[in-house]
Amino acid sequence: MESEMSDPQPLQEERYDMSGARLALTLCVTKAREGSEVDMEALERMFRYLKFESTMKRDPTAQQFLEELDEFQQTIDNWEEPVSCAFVVLMAHGEEGLLKGEDEKMVRLEDLFEVLNNKNCKALRGKPKVYIIQACRGEHRDPGEELRGNEELGGDEELGGDEVAVLKNNPQSIPTYTDTLHIYSTVEGYLSYRHDEKGSGFIQTLTDVFIHKKGSILELTEEITRLMANTEVMQEGKPRKVNPEVQSTLRKKLYLQ
């Protein structure tokens, strides 16, 4: 006997309150990174259009990456009015999990992400924190694969494992790492690309979409991924493909406009 099942119910849309201050910090290594100034100009236009209080710092050393994030955290916690959202843009040469400072030394991305989490930044508890990372994450190059006919990429996910968890509703507390969005210029293990005169395709596409399109930020990142997946980068005379990677622990819809 088949059990009766009710019709699926649409999700209730819950949005982050964006009526408070919006703060942004951009840390960019321009040394040996031609085209990065063009990216910074595009980001400044975007933040101005989206009504962010924006701070931009050039050529931080590895240690200064951490120091600037610490100072940004203190600025947020001491802001006179409620803060709704924070953006952090990190642009540098990189490897898997690492960024290279102006002094050629490395800083761990995880150490940078720790600074604004729900434990360390009280003013941003339960508030969206968006990281945009324009950097290589390895040495692999993606030549791309051809789609056949109406073939689309997709797959099924399974939830499994040996752990047993007891769940109970406790809205009075939240995990340390919620309300965070990481937008990487490329997938883990792969190179990121930048044009000497036009800047990076990632930053230029992102700023264009964030200014000219409306939707939740996750919908906007889907559009950025679609646009970048449809373009080709020439490197050493060979066509390459690149697409962003998005990691989200957002609990609500984030709308910038």
Swiss-Prot record:
Keywords: Cytoplasm, Differentiation, Hydrolase, Nucleus, Protease, Thiol protease, Zymogen. Changing residue 136 to A: Decrease in death-inducing activity. One of its GO terms (biological process) is cell differentiation. Disruption phenotype: Mice show a shiny and lichenified skin with an epidermis containing more alveolar keratohyalin F-granules and an altered profilaggrin processing. The skin is highly sensitive to the formation of cyclobutane pyrimidine dimers after UVB irradiation, leading to increased levels of UVB-induced apoptosis. Mice accumulate incomplete filaggrin breakdown products within the epidermal stratum corneum (SC), leading to reduced levels of natural moisturizing factors (NMFs) and lower SC hydration. Embryo, adult liver and less in adult brain and kidney. Expressed in differentiating keratinocytes of embryonic skin (at protein level). Expressed in keratinocytes of adult skin suprabasal layers (at protein level). GO terms for molecular function: cysteine-type endopeptidase activity; peptidase activity. It is found in: Cytoplasm; Nucleus. Its EC number is 3.4.22.-. Its main location: cytoplasm. GO terms for cellular component: cornified envelope; cytosol; keratin filament; mitochondrion; nucleoplasm. Non-apoptotic caspase which is involved in epidermal differentiation. Seems to play a role in keratinocyte differentiation and is required for cornification. Regulates maturation of the epidermis by proteolytically processing filaggrin. In vitro is equally active on the synthetic caspase substrates WEHD-ACF and IETD-AFC. Involved in processing of prosaposin in the epidermis. May be involved in retinal pigment epithelium cell barrier function. Heterodimer of a large and a small subunit, both processed from the precursor; the mature active form is a p17/p10 dimer and the intermediate form a p20/p8 dimer. Belongs to the peptidase C14A family. This is Caspase-14. It comes from Mus musculus (Mouse). The gene is Casp14.
